[in-house]
Swiss-Prot record:
The 20S proteasome core is composed of 14 alpha and 14 beta subunits that assemble into four stacked heptameric rings, resulting in a barrel-shaped structure. The two inner rings, each composed of seven catalytic beta subunits, are sandwiched by two outer rings, each composed of seven alpha subunits. The catalytic chamber with the active sites is on the inside of the barrel. Has a gated structure, the ends of the cylinder being occluded by the N-termini of the alpha-subunits. Is capped at one or both ends by the proteasome regulatory ATPase, PAN. The formation of the proteasomal ATPase PAN-20S proteasome complex, via the docking of the C-termini of PAN into the intersubunit pockets in the alpha-rings, triggers opening of the gate for substrate entry. Interconversion between the open-gate and close-gate conformations leads to a dynamic regulation of the 20S proteasome proteolysis activity. This is Proteasome subunit alpha. SUPFAM superfamilies: N-terminal nucleophile aminohydrolases (Ntn hydrolases) (SSF56235). Component of the proteasome core, a large protease complex with broad specificity involved in protein degradation. The lineage of its organism: Archaea, Methanobacteriati, Thermoplasmatota, Thermoplasmata, Thermoplasmatales. NCBIfam families: arc_protsome_A, PRK03996.1. It is found in: Cytoplasm. The keyword Cytoplasm applies. Belongs to the peptidase T1A family. Keywords: Cytoplasm, Proteasome. InterPro entries: Ntn_hydrolases_N, Proteasome_alpha, Proteasome_alpha-type, Proteasome_asu_arc, Proteasome_asu_N, Proteasome_sua/b. The keyword Nucleotide-binding does not apply. One of its GO terms (cellular component) is proteasome core complex, alpha-subunit complex.
Amino acid sequence: MQQGQMAYDRAITVFSPDGRLFQVEYAREAVKKGSTALGIKFKDGVALISEKKVRSRLVEKTSLEKIQLIDDRVAAVTSGLVADARVLIDFARISDQQEKVTYGSLMNIENLVKRVADQMQQYTQYGGVRPYGVSIIFAGLDSIGPRLFDCDPAGTINEYKCVSIGAGKDQVTAYLEKEYKENLSEDEAIRMGIAALKSAVADESSMKEPEIASIKMGETFHVFTSEEVSKYLN
C-alpha cells in the first residue's frame, strides 16, 4: 500500500487528494470476489441468472439461494458479502411492506431501488460504519414494463437492458455487448444468459445447476425448479 494512500483509507469520510474514497473502492473489490450473476430483459419480461457455488459437499444446496424475491413482482440477485446482502434484502422487503401498510399498495420498483441505494449511500459518509460490500441487481415489472437496475456499494443506480455483477462481470458484459438483441424470447434470453455465464466462470461445477428466475407481463416471478433449469444446460 502506498504511504499516501494509507493516510486516507482509515476513515470512510475522508477523501484522498485525487477525490477517492478508498473504503468504497475496497467494498467494490469485495463484490469482484463474489459469485457471477446477471439480469437480462426479453420481449415481455426480465430474467435473473446466477452461478451457484457449493464450497463443500456437506452443504445443503437448498440453503444457498442467490436469487431472492422481494415480493411477487420484484426479485433481486446479489454478489459480494452474503451477510451484507441478507441485511439489504430484508431492508428492501420491509420497506416494500411498509409502503403497502401505509398507502395500500406495494412500492414502485424504481422507488424501491432508490430506497435501498439511499441506505447504501449513507454508509459511505458517516464515521463508525463501513460500506456494504455487495452489489445488487433488481428486476421486475411496473406500468412502464420490464425494469432492470444495478446498485453498487456507493449507492449508485443504473438501469440496463442486461447487466452483470460479480467476479466474471467483465467477461459477461463483453459477451452480452456482442450478442444481445432486443425483443428476445424468454427462452432465447435465458440461453444467452447461461452462455454468457459459462464464458466467464472458471469453476464449471458452479454452472451445473445455476439459479434462474423470470417474470413476464401479467404474471408473477417464477423461480425455476431443478428440472426446468436442466433443459437449458443440454
